[in-house]
């Protein structure tokens, strides 16, 4: 997953428990509450609650699922390096095996089909296609993803393919520091074109990047995820990096990389393949801590430093004016030619949404003095508590509070700010702990997860039917319990329980039956 989390596609990291303040802060985002709010719980959801053609699926990521890290010519990635660095992963695990989907994809596709899922969002490992990031194509990698795509289509499941879900080839990190160098734009575009050419006859929905905001913050500001660069707390945690500049450089290159890939697709492949390209943005929703003007403005500003940072250039041709004013010369500028290519380069908006926080104006200099980073630039503080009371019930991950109304508010924000773009919820879900003292039988009783999906989907349906938001699909994170980035195997997001002690056997949680009933009605 991707998120301040480590996830899913999330970015959840259990290590944030030791630095709860950093957790909240580094997942900045927010805006004033808009739109009507549906009840926290809703009943009677069916397929008919959503428009005709609305897509239901589950989501995954290559590094979290595949395993087989040294098979069939796959090259090393920055996450291989990070996971094998002592102290980086909460449970000291790695994803060398993960849930072994590389070998078990046919079994897992059958699980999706049995539930009645329409689509599967998975990522291609760049280092399986180009082991060194560039150069010679690895045919074994091409063959594997052809088999996966064909197997999905044979079961009537549409592939939604992510090109980059955090697993940069280590060779490019070694060669020129990866996303910090402008060369990455051309190398990513070349990799993307190879995927368009090889798989585009069957893949009609491409997600070029998963959670670029999470990568910029967790990888280059907080240093809690690969490649683990930062300068916060006087480099006590990271050996190298600059938290005040590198996140902005990396973000700029992400935006240019998507635009370059989109330009190639539209010029050479769109006419014959007729696919669409988007990005999966990680977006927390934030409500003002109070109804004061200063907190309302802080919430808006925080959201601009999250979604606006990465989405505004595609709709308006530049970063938010608030960022220009507060970041100054540290925020890169688009040339006129670059802005022309970037603006309009999104066919749809992917949203990875899990939780909602309160946001207030930061009226102290402590954060700026200690961190000197993007959080300090926002001038905000985001917390899941107000007056000592949590904003909602908490899942297992310390960052994940269950606030279904945030889904509807966020959809209205996207509709209003970006003039009703097509939206897919590319990730949404919650986790349980990997508790060794709970039996498998009890672990399958996930009523909390059922309520989570029911309530978030109820608010999503209301945003479509009552508010006119153009939302076209929903992907649950995740099909299986899996390796959750810096949280390792300590966090279970799956609809299916994976027995890590017994050959990775898959067992359906009660939420599987809930989705099956939803999708059949």
UniProtKB/Swiss-Prot annotation:
Protein name (record): Beta-glucosidase 6
Self-association and partners: Homodimer.
GO biological process: carbohydrate metabolic process
Signal peptide: 1-38
UniProt xrefs under PANTHER family: BETA-GLUCOSIDASE 6, GLYCOSYL HYDROLASE
Effect of residue 427 to D: Decreases activity toward gibberellin A4 beta-D-glucosyl ester 70-fold
Sites where a glycan is attached: 291, 362, 372
A GO cellular component annotation in the UniProt record: extracellular region
Top-level enzyme category: hydrolase
Keyword Lipid biosynthesis: no
Enzyme Commission code(s) on record: 3.2.1.21
List of residues binding a beta-D-glucoside: 64, 165, 210-211, 354, 427, 477, 484-485, 493
The family this protein is said to belong to: Belongs to the glycosyl hydrolase 1 family.
Effect listed in the UniProt record for changing residue 284 to N: Decreases the kcat/Km values 7 to 30-fold depending on the substrate
Stated pH dependence: Optimum pH is 4.5.
Top-level taxonomic group: Eukaryota
Keywords from the UniProt entry: Disulfide bond, Glycoprotein, Glycosidase, Hydrolase, Secreted, Signal
Source organism (scientific name): Oryza sativa subsp. japonica
A molecular function (GO) term: beta-D-fucosidase activity
Active-site residue list: 211, 427
């Amino acid at each position: 997953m991707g998120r301040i989390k480590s996830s899913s596609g999330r970015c959840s990291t259990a290590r944030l428990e030791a630095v709860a303040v950093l957790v909240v802060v580094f997942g900045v985002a927010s805006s004033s509450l808009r739109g009507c709010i549906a009840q926290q719980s809703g009943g009677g959801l069916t397929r008919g609650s959503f428009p005709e053609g609305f897509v239901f699926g589950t989501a995954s990521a290559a590094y979290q699922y595949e395993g087989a890290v040294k098979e069939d010519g796959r090259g090393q990635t920055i996450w291989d390096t990070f996971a094998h660095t002592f102290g980086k992963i909460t449970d000291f695990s790695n994803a060398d095996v993960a849930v072994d989907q590389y070998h078990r994809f046919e079994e897992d596709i059958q699980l999706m089909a049995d539930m009645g899922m329409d689509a599967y969002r998975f990522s291609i490992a760049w280092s399986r296609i180009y082991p060194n990031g560039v150069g010679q194509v690895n045919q074994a990698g091409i063959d594997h993803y052809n088999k996966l795509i064909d197997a999905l289509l044979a079961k009537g499941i549409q592939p939604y393919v992510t090109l980059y879900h955090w697993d940069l080839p280590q060779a490019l990190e070694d060669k020129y520091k990866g996303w910090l160098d402008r060369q990455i734009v051309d190398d990513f575009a070349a990799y993307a074109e190879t995927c368009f050419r090889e798989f585009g006859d069957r893949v009609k929905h491409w997600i070029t990047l998963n959670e670029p905001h999470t990568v910029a913050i967790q990888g280059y500001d907080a240093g809690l995820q690969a490649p683990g660069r930062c300068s916060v707390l006087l480099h006590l945690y990271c050996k190298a990096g600059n938290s005040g500049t590198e996140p902005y450089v990396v973000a700029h290159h992400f935006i240019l990389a998507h635009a370059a890939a989109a330009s190639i697709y539209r010029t050479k492949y769109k006419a014959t393949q007729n696919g669409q390209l988007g990005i999966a943005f990680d977006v927390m929703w934030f409500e003002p801590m109070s109804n004061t003007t200063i907190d309302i403005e802080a919430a808006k500003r925080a959201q601009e430093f999250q979604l606006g940072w990465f989405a505004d250039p595609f709709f308006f041709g530049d970063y938010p004016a608030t960022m220009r004013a507060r970041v100054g010369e540290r925020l890169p500028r688009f040339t006129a030619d670059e802005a022309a290519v970037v603006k309009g380069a999104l066919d749809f908006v992917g949203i990875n949404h899990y939780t909602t926080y309160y946001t207030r104006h930061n009226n102290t200099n402590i954060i700026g003095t200690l961190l000197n980073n993007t959080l300090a630039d926002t001038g905000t503080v985001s917390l899941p508590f107000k007056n000592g009371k949590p904003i909602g019930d908490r899942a297992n991950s310390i960052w994940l509070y269950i606030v279904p109304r945030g889904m509807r508010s966020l959809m209205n924000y996207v509709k209003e700010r970006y003039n009703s773009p097509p939206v897919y919820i590319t990730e949404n879900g919650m986790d349980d702990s990997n508790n060794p003292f709970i039996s498998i039988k009890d672990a399958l009783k996930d009523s909390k997860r059922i309520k989570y999906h029911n309530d978030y989907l109820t608010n999503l349906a209301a945003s479509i039917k009552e508010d006119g938001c153009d939302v076209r699909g929903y992907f649950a994170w995740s099909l299986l319990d899996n390796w959750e980035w810096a949280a390792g195997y300590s966090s279970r997001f799956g609809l299916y329980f994976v027995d890590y002690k017994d050959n990775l056997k898959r067992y359906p949680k009660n939420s599987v039956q809930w989705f099956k009933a939803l999708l059949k009605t």
